[in-house]
Structure formats: structure tokens, C-alpha cells
Amino acid sequence: LEQGYDTSCGMSVVATALDLYWGEPATETGIITATLGGAVDSGLYTVSLADMAAAFAAYGVAARAFKLDWEGLNAVVAKGYSPIVVHYERPERHFALLLGFKGGRAVTADPARGLESLSREAFETRYSGSAMALASKALSVDGALVDRAVAEAAGRHERLESAASRFALRAGR
């Protein structure tokens, strides 16, 4: 789901994870209202991982924050914990969902940029090292949807690379 406000990426990530991947109806505005106590009109929606964990808990999803590097994120995804909330520091503070890895690339659902396939270097340039794993006894993630999103982003990247290679070959003639 695309974030509706300049500073609402955290609540948009919560709504996307719940609504799209966990199948629990949720909206960004509803999460903001419930979590920030009616502050929808204030325009101030910047939140922390702790605020996001509280929002997830209200829907029966446990959230635990970790400091993880690239390998640690790969290990958590390999154990079936996907999507994972990731925090970016660059180019500005921001939250996204890490859906998985394919072909040495991280696939993210970014509330401002959409579905992305990022090289390790591009991901690590943005990533702060803070992530949050999610789990629930009552709800389950639509793993097939996560897998399709990862495959779609990876396929899009492969098609772009192929087109760029063909263009470079033609330009070199």
C-alpha cells in the first residue's frame, strides 16, 4: 500500500503487512488513529519500531526488533519470517518491508517506492541495521503472495537488465 502522508511510512508498513500479507483488514489511517490517538489531522506520523510493534500487537501479531546484517536478514527469511520490517537511514529515515531474497538481491515493498529488487550494495546503503520480525499464533502470512511478489520484482529486474544489455549492444554498433 502506498503511504498516504509524507511521514507515515511506518504506519503504512504496518497496514501493508497486516492487510496484504497477513490477511487482516487494516488501513493506514485506521492504524494512525488507533496508535497515535486521533492525530490524523496533525500531519505528524513519525513512529519508532516500538510504536509499530504496539500497532502490530493490537492485531495479534508479535513483533521483535533486532540488529541484523545482510546475512542475519537472509537467515531470518530462510526460517520463514517474512515479511520483515526494515529501517532505512539513508537517504532519509524510512521503513519498508523486506519480502525476501532472490539472485543475491533484496526484494522490498516500500510504501513510497513500491516493489523493489535491490542489490546488496543498494540495500546496505539505505539500511540502518535495525529490523523487526513478526509472528502470530492466530494469523498466518500468505506465503504464496510473498513468493509471487519476490518473483515479480526479481523478474522485473532481470527484464530490465536484459533490455539494458541489448540497448548497450545496439549503441555500440
Tell where the protein language model's regions lie, with residue ranges:
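Active-site-adjacent structural segments surrounding the nucleophilic cysteine of cysteine proteases
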Residues: 1-40, 158-160, 170-173
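Glutamate identity and glutamate-enriched acidic tracts
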Residues: 2, 24, 28, 71, ...
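Low-complexity, Gly/Ser/Thr/Pro-rich intrinsically disordered linker/tail segments
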Residues: 129-173
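Conserved active-site-adjacent core of cysteine acyl-enzyme catalytic domains
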Residues: 34-136, 141-144
